[in-house]
């Protein structure tokens, strides 16, 4: 039983900087905030009974408690009957959640699905492996959970940035090109904030005041304001000291945030008289050598277009690539021979931030905002993930 899959609501939290404005919130709390924001936009759906499933990405799950997706659902007010699945496909987790949700509806297993993701990189713990068996004698080691499970290649133990350097060498992408890309990403995101382009997608997060201080609301992405052009250009390379090109400034930062998307079947769309925002036209995934994860999106995008029945990539109005590093945006634009003016027009993860388990949904939320506000119809989102993979989704604005 194949049927169309519609997006009827999207929402995301602002993206907080590492140990920044959202540091007091767990990933589950951020996920629930995003989901509540999405639910508020579709009052026709009864949160307690109309939802069949939630599929939510989360990468750094240590110390969150069992089944983060289930926690998000119940915290946001969904019924106890809801089936919940947490996805860990590293950076592509939330996009995989969207794909799985669409497949569930297409197969007739569900009619209303929440897809998205959440991450608090700030609150990811350190690990002490020796504590389980007893450290016995002398010093022991603390392992950074963010680095171990989020930012290091599991196969060679190298930082993902080392492979970003490999990509720059392999594809002849210079430090100047990466710095220019990063500056442009910041400038586009700053301009988009100024013009209110993100207002419809962001749901404010309330931060409880302490010691008699009033509660505050976080309403904007925190990172874009941190641009200092001269500091960015003079930043030292991190992963390759001599003749390196990748810096902390032209890579995405470490962040906190969440995003949620509500998917429905055509039957529920008509039955509940819902207004469709977009249709999920297709998706595609690919993988190759783990060290080449940076350009895996260029393999996933053609698969997604084929699945969506789109033969000419030039007919796509806008693209959203997750900017894990500036080189990721540059290399995939280069390989696919895209018009750069169609790519990440509101800025990307270098400037907005990259909360790992959230980003795959965040790029789709922002892509839909772009299509709605810039007059486009067809959009493609893609995101690479550790291990050499990538996921891509094609949407059509309605």
UniProtKB/Swiss-Prot annotation:
Domain of life: Eukaryota
Claim: Acetylation is one of the keywords in the record: yes
Compartmental location: Cytoplasm
Active-site residue list: 91, 354, 384
BP-aspect Gene Ontology terms: ergosterol biosynthetic process; fatty acid beta-oxidation
Residues where K(+) binds: 186, 248-249, 251, 350
Keyword terms: Acetylation, Acyltransferase, Cytoplasm, Metal-binding, Potassium, Transferase
Positions bearing N-acetylserine: 2
EC number: 2.3.1.9
Catalytic activity reported: 2 acetyl-CoA = acetoacetyl-CoA + CoA
Coiled coil region boundaries: none
Keyword Cytoplasm part of the UniProt annotation: yes
Gene Ontology molecular function terms on file: acetyl-CoA C-acetyltransferase activity; metal ion binding
Entry-linked InterPro entries: Thiolase (IPR002155), Thiolase-like (IPR016039), Thiolase_acyl_enz_int_AS (IPR020615), Thiolase_AS (IPR020610), Thiolase_C (IPR020617), Thiolase_CS (IPR020613), Thiolase_N (IPR020616)
Binding site for CoA: 186, 231, 252
Pathway(s) of this molecule: Metabolic intermediate biosynthesis; (R)-mevalonate biosynthesis; (R)-mevalonate from acetyl-CoA: step 1/3
GO cellular component, one term: mitochondrion
Record family assignment: Belongs to the thiolase-like superfamily. Thiolase family.
Its job: Acetyl-CoA acetyltransferase; part of the first module of ergosterol biosynthesis pathway that includes the early steps of the pathway, conserved across all eukaryotes, and which results in the formation of mevalonate from acetyl-coenzyme A (acetyl-CoA). In this module, the acetyl-CoA acetyltransferase ERG10 catalyzes the formation of acetoacetyl-CoA. The hydroxymethylglutaryl-CoA synthase ERG13 then condenses acetyl-CoA with acetoacetyl-CoA to form HMG-CoA.
Subunit (UniProt): Homotetramer.
Protein name per Swiss-Prot or TrEMBL: Acetyl-CoA acetyltransferase
Lineage: Eukaryota, Fungi, Dikarya, Ascomycota, Saccharomycotina
């Amino acid at each position: 039983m194949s049927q169309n899959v519609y997006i009827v609501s999207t929402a995301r939290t602002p993206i907080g900087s590492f140990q920044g404005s959202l540091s007091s919130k767990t990933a589950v709390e951020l996920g629930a905030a995003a989901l509540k924001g999405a639910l508020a936009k579709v009052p026709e759906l009864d949160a307690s009974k109309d939802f069949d499933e939630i599929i939510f990405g989360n990468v750094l799950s240590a110390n969150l408690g069992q089944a983060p997706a289930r926690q998000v659902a119940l915290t946001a007010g969904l019924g106890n009957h809801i089936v919940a699945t947490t996805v860990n496909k590293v950076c592509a987790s939330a996009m995989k959640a969207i794909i799985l949700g669409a497949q569930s509806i297409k197969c007739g297993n569900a009619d209303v699905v929440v897809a998205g993701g959440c991450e608090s990189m700030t609150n990811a713990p350190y690990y002490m492996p020796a504590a389980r068996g007893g450290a016995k004698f002398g010093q022991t080691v603390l392992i950074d959970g963010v680095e171990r499970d989020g930012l290091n290649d599991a196969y060679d133990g190298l930082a993902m940035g080392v492979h970003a350097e490999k990509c720059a060498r392999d594809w002849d992408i210079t430090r100047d090109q990466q710095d220019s890309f990063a500056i442009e990403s910041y400038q586009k995101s700053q301009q988009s904030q100024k013009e209110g382009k993100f207002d419809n997608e962001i749901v404010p997060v309330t931060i409880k005041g302490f010691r008699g201080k009033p509660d505050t609301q976080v309403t904007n992405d925190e990172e874009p304001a941190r641009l200092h052009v001269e500091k960015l250009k003079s930043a030292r390379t991190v992963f390759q000291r001599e003749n390196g090109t990748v810096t902390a400034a032209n890579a995405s930062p470490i962040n906190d945030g969440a995003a949620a998307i509500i998917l429905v079947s055509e039957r529920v769309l008509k039955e509940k008289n819902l207004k469709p925002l977009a249709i999920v036209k297709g998706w595609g995934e690919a993988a190759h050598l783990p060290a080449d994860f940076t350009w895996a999106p260029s393999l996933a995008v053609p698969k997604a277009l084929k699945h969506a029945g789109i033969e000419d990539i030039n007919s796509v109005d806008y693209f959203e690539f997750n900017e894990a590093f500036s080189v990721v945006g540059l290399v995939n634009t280069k390989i696919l021979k895209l018009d750069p003016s169609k790519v990440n027009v509101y800025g990307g993860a270098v400037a907005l931030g990259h909360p790992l388990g959230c980003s795959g949904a965040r790029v789709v939320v922002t892509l839909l905002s772009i299509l709605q506000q810039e007059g486009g119809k067809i959009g493609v989102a893609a995101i690479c993930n550790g291990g050499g993979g990538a996921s891509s989704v094609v949407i059509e604005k309605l």
